[in-house]
């Protein structure tokens, strides 16, 4: 970019997204994967793995299992994953089961919920999100003193505050003209408006979303039940919390349909420490909650917990599905440079289990 940052973009590697260009898509995907495997020299002349663009490899019927038409391309993707921990994996099967369509996220993990135009055609490109307001779930849990009923009362209040933040963001755009960013609003990146047109016209017509995020589900469940959400009791509460969040946003959309609320599994890359500091300052040191220096990403299982990679995906997949605004699950492994076969087995499990994941 003009200020020297890596563009925060993703490349969608969905072979059958446009069937008439399938062969061309395969050639492009092959080249992207070969380039990622080769790596890029940094300023010191050392070959390194570039962070962006993110590569998103879509697993489908034609490339997941041995014998499928493009399995050779998946083997190349697995080689890239083994060496570069990229591409990420999107399951066409699971996404279609849940959303009816398969489509890419924006950047790393922010998905746009399905939106159809006046002709009932889904739109996935030329859309965007107006911003995210994230809720610190453990804060509500600690404020409740361990009373689950009180926790949900407090969570409801915080959701209402987040709704107001989203509404404010939308209203701040009222009266903003297309001339503020011609390449976006006048020249076709998003729309082709006249310079004096309000951008809200395009935002409404193209189904932009506003997002409420959440983080620290693990700490919340652990504080309220004393158990991880890998246990039956812990998971039942975790699932109930996720359903409550999703249903609350669905109710918001009934009364404010123009805002198109979506639930986002906040990654906590920049705010994890800040949220943790606020918890510790307010509630003191609480074992396994405020004593770590971080709170756990979205719905994820605690990174310190010993768990099989396949089981981790099994559990987290059930929680990921609530996050219509996007979320990603990770698994951590030992170096797999010489074990592409194991990567391929993980790919198969991801295809059958979870929408979006990475190694």
Where would I find each of the regions flagged by the language model?
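Conserved catalytic cores of very large enzyme subunits
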Residues: 1-206, 223, 227, 231-359
């Amino acid at each position: 970019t003009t200020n020297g940052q890596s563009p925060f973009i993703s490349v969608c590697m969905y072979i059958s997204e446009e069937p008439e260009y399938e062969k061309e898509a395969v050639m492009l995907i092959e080249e992207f994967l070969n380039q990622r495997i080769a790596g890029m020299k940094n300023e010191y002349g050392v070959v390194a793995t570039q962070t962006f663009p993110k590569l998103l490899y879509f697993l489908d019927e034609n490339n997941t299992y041995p014998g499928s038409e493009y399995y050779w391309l998946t083997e190349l993707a697995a080689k890239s994953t083994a060496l570069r921990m990229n591409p990420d994996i999107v399951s066409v099967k699971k996404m279609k089961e849940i959303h009816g369509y398969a489509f890419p996220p924006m950047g790393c993990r922010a998905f746009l919920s399905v939106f159809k135009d006046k002709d009932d055609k889904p739109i996935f490109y030329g859309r965007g999100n107006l911003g995210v307001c994230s809720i610190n779930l453990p804060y509500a849990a600690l404020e409740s003193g361990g009373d689950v009923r009180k926790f949900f009362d407090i969570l409801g209040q915080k959701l209402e505050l987040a709704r107001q933040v989203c509404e404010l963001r939308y209203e701040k755009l009222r009266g903003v003209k297309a001339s503020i960013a011609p390449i976006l609003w006048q020249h076709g990146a998003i729309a082709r408006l006249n310079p004096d047109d309000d951008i809200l016209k395009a935002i409404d017509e193209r189904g932009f979303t506003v997002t409420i995020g959440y983080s620290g589900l693990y700490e919340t469940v652990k504080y309220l039940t004393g158990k991880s959400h890998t246990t039956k009791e812990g998971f039942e509460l975790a699932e109930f919390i996720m359903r409550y969040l999703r249903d609350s946003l669905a109710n918001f959309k009934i009364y404010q349909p123009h805002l198109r609320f979506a639930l986002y599994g906040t990654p906590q890359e920049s705010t994890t420490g800040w949220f943790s500091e606020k918890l510790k300052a307010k509630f003191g040191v609480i074992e396994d909650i405020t004593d770590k220096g971080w709170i756990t990403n979205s719905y994820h299982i605690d990174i310190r917990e010993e768990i099989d990679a396949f089981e981790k995906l099994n559990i987290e997949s059930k929680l990921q599905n609530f996050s219509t605004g996007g979320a990603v699950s990770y698994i951590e492994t030992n170096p797999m440079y010489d074990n592409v076969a194991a990567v391929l087995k993980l790919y198969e499990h991801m295809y059958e289990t979870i929408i979006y994941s990475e190694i």
